[in-house]
Regions:
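N-terminal pre-core extensions flanking Radical SAM catalytic domains
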Residues: 1-161, 177-178, 341-383
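Conserved C-terminal portion of the radical SAM core fold
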Residues: 33-34, 216, 236-241, 261-382
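Core AdoMet radical
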Residues: 117-127, 138-166, 179-195, 207-226, ...
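Eukaryote-biased activation of long, low-complexity terminal tails and linkers
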Residues: 154-169, 182-184, 200-204, 211, ...
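Short amphipathic alpha-helix with an adjacent loop that forms part of the alpha/beta core around
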Residues: 170-177, 230-232
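Short, well-ordered amphipathic alpha-helices
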Residues: 170-171, 197-205, 263-269, 296
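Distinct, well-ordered alpha-helical segments
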Residues: 196-202, 225-232, 290-294
Length: 383
């Protein structure tokens, strides 16, 4: 068997280019927020698998998984993996490459014959206590009341599958398939609001399996407590992607109704622990000028880094809709900031004579509903 684990990064990339194979369908059990199954977080989900109606075995052995596995066994791309295929055609690093590197230490020859779950990637429905301005009812239950009053959200439907993690039995069934697991990935909604999440962790601790398991969370941080930190000490590694989209009143507007003093309290809880914390920031026209303050916080608390993503929806919040005056100001301000993704984003900003009038309209709608004042907080969208 080829020892992929011993390959250097460049050699691994070369191997991936020569071999159309991904280990993810053989080791990874992944769900969507709205109650569907998928091969990984980048694949197309199967509409034939409803998490409210299936158990782990019936999903793992479903033809959706088997068809993908057979495609990879035959050095072919499955239909559900078009995103990785497209990225690699442009020589952009894909999820397939990440998964193959992550699981290079396993016996792939054996897994090709007998797939075994080593990772549960669980998006635990849409239960959430915040209603961020770039979110929707699909990812937050607290958005339900507001979305009926806002024009661009009227097309969203509240689907039964969004409640799968609360009403279904799948999370209870997971403990019957967890003995080999090395990684648990929790996202939401807000995953720490789900009580069954604690049940799974305590089961692993009681069975003395936790020291072999790493945990990853996408979290808004509001629910983190000393009890969680004590619980996490029993695991091999814990990584938090802690969402923060600005500082002080900017974050409070974006991640409504969060209080920034509470965010700093959670930062102090996590400071000087062995938990890996990365700040997760979604950049848009509204918060781009505040990004340097997030990097300052990361350094102040000695966190592991800042993950920069880009707001795609609603479209009016995209960076390209800033005025040219602000774009020029950003290019100058961020010239020396040491973050390649951010540098690439700023360099790619085109001067297009845009006007953020739709963004101004959206924020005005939010202000009426939430009794806020965006003009005081984001004056640059009027410059």
């Amino acid at each position: 068997m080829l020892k992929l684990e011993s390959l250097k990064m460049d050699d691994m990339r070369s191997w991936n280019k020569k071999n159309i194979f991904c280990i993810a369908p053989f080791v990874n059990f992944s769900t969507t927020t709205d109650g569907l199954a998928r091969l990984c977080c980048q694949s197309t989900a199967s509409t034939d698998i409803n998490l409210l109606e299936h158990d782990v075995d019936s999903i793992w052995n479903h033809q959706y998984y088997e068809q993908a596995r057979n495609s990879f066994r035959n050095n072919q791309w499955p239909e559900s993996c078009s995103m990785c295929k497209n990225l690699e055609s442009k020589d952009i690093k894909s999820r397939r490459e990440l998964e193959n590197r992550r699981w290079a230490h396993l016996n792939w020859d054996e897994l090709k014959k007998n797939p075994k779950i080593y990772c549960f990637d669980l998006r635990l429905g849409n239960q959430c206590n915040l209603k961020c301005i770039m979110c929707t009812p699909r990812n937050s239950t607290t958005w339900y009341d507001d979305y009926k009053q806002i024009e661009h959200l009227k097309g969203w439907k509240v689907l039964p599958g969004l409640q799968w993690a609360l009403k279904g039995d799948l999370l209870d069934d997971i403990i019957n398939h967890i003995d080999n697991v090395e990684l648990l990935y929790f996202s939401g909604g807000e995953p720490l609001l789900n009580k069954k999440h604690n049940f799974i962790l305590n089961y692993l601790i009681d069975k003395k399996l936790s020291h072999n398991v790493s945990l990853i969370y996408d979290t808004n941080g509001t629910q983190i407590s000393k009890k969680h930190i004590e619980l996490w000490h029993a695991f091999k590694k814990v990584s938090l992607n802690f969402s923060i989209d600005g500082t002080y009143e900017i974050d409070e507007y974006i991640r409504y109704p969060i209080k920034f003093d509470d965010v700093l309290t959670k930062f102090n809880l996590l400071k000087n622990t062995d938990i890996e914390v990365k700040l997760q920031c979604a950049l848009g026209a509204h918060n781009l000028l505040d990004i340097t303050n997030i990097f300052t916080l990361q350094e102040e608390y000695n966190f592991a880094g800042v993950n920069v993503t880009v707001v795609q929806w609603p479209e009016c919040m995209q960076i390209k809709y800033l005025t040219d005056n602000i774009k020029i100001k950003c290019k100058k301000k961020f010239n020396k900031l040491n973050n390649k993704r951010l540098q690439d984003m700023i360099s790619a900003l085109e001067l297009t004579n845009n006007n953020p009038i739709k963004l101004q309209k959206y924020f005005t709608q939010l202000d009426k509903i939430r009794n806020t004042n965006h003009k005081e907080i984001f004056p640059w969208i009027y410059e």
